[in-house]
Amino acid sequence: MNTEIHYRKASENDIDFLLDLRTKTMNEHYTNSSLPTDRASTLQRVLYQFEKANIILFNNEPVGLLKIDRSKDPIEVLQLQIDPGQQGKGLGKTILQSILEEASSAGKKVSLSVLKSNKAQHLYSSLGFKAVGEDEHSYFMSFSDR
């Protein structure tokens, strides 16, 4: 797939975009998991480790969020959200494959968590992520080519 995916560091100017994105991509899953969907809870999730937030640009338009911590092993994908209007185009898969290649080159694993009600877990499994734990609401997944 020939995609023009770029990233830029998220800033305070992106908060409204990120609130809207999070509402569109996650509220259904939070509701299904009996987790709060009010604005304050959503803002708290947007601001969580905000210094690691990157706006995903597709053809120079903001289409999502990648929050990632590359500082340790495993590399942790904290949040990956693609606007529903851009889903199904392979963007998430392309982004994750790039992260997996980066991790492989660095000799690191990759971890993430996914709500049990979120169908994205099928994408993660198809890329080789394995569930290594769970809690009431989420699966904790890991990828390693070692």
Please give the residue ranges for each predicted region.
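A short beta-loop-alpha structural element at the N-terminal edge
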Residues: 5-20
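Conserved GNAT-fold acetyl-CoA-binding loop/helix
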Residues: 23-51
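Conserved beta-strand in the GNAT
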Residues: 55, 61-69, 74-81
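A short, internal acetyl-CoA/4′-phosphopantetheine-binding micro-motif in the GNAT/acyltransferase core
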Residues: 80-87, 114-115
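Conserved acetyl-CoA-binding loop-helix of GNAT-fold acetyltransferases
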Residues: 88-101, 122, 126
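Short glycine/proline-centered loop/turn elements that form peptide/ligand docking sites
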Residues: 92, 96, 117-120, 137-143
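Conserved GNAT acetyl-CoA-binding A-motif
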Residues: 103-115
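Conserved acetyl-CoA-binding loop of GNAT-fold acetyltransferases
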Residues: 125-135
